[in-house]
């Protein structure tokens, strides 16, 4: 009877048993509630086909979609002290870091990539919101500076995709130090005469908007992105007034002159390639989609 109980019965159970469905097989559209098949979403760069809603995207996926043929080289993340303040809230900061590293496979919230877009060599830096809300700490700050320095070394244009909740509170003043440090790196790039394009994605808030994310030569925003220093709820509680509808959205900011254009993720590569070719005085691709421009009333404002 042992072979029946040990082999036959488990085999039958495995054949007849209910197969578990992966949790991430279907993705819910936050704007409409529609369920979208994961593979359909990924093939569309994580933009909902029906509504155009831009889902958050992992850094490595962002680079894969952005670079020619999905090919790029990443820079090794700089080594920094993990927890110099020995900070603890609900759990030790160092344990929280280890948890996020295990879940994301990343050292910190920044990934630097080297590759080409439409044949033009560039350096691209991506902030990943899935790693502690894309917060800016020593590791992230050092990686951003590394990206700027590599662009200067190779004499390449620099593109940064911002997505962050702001400074990393667990690192205190050491986190805030990254604001002036990254600002200096921006100035170094500009002194080298190299283009700097910033893509503001959802969300880009806090100290990031008080430093490198708003210092680009050109600022592009993805549709529907939340962009601002403090969140709308905090502002309403402070001034005790209701904010205008769509306040701090990418479209609102473009209408009021805070960003240069709002571009769908599906058109970002072609748009940025055309802009960089113009900025570096190379022949531009006439087939690239034209950027969205503010109307006359917006210009007057």
Curated annotation (Swiss-Prot):
Reaction equation(s) it catalyzes: N(6)-carboxybiotinyl-L-lysyl-[protein] + acetyl-CoA = N(6)-biotinyl-L-lysyl-[protein] + malonyl-CoA
PANTHER family: ACETYL-COENZYME A CARBOXYLASE CARBOXYL TRANSFERASE SUBUNIT BETA, CHLOROPLASTIC
Species the sequence originates in: Brucella abortus (strain 2308)
Function: Component of the acetyl coenzyme A carboxylase (ACC) complex. Biotin carboxylase (BC) catalyzes the carboxylation of biotin on its carrier protein (BCCP) and then the CO(2) group is transferred by the transcarboxylase to acetyl-CoA to form malonyl-CoA.
Gene Ontology CC entries for this record: acetate CoA-transferase complex
Descriptive protein name: Acetyl-coenzyme A carboxylase carboxyl transferase subunit beta
InterPro entries: AcCoA_carboxyl_beta, Acetyl_CoA_COase_Trfase_b_su, ClpP/crotonase-like_dom_sf, COA_CT_N
Subcellular compartments: Cytoplasm
Gene3D superfamilies: 2-enoyl-CoA Hydratase, Chain A, domain 1
PROSITE patterns (UniProt xref): COA_CT_NTER
Alphabetical keyword list: ATP-binding, Cytoplasm, Fatty acid biosynthesis, Fatty acid metabolism, Lipid biosynthesis, Lipid metabolism, Nucleotide-binding, Transferase
GO biological process: fatty acid biosynthetic process; malonyl-CoA biosynthetic process
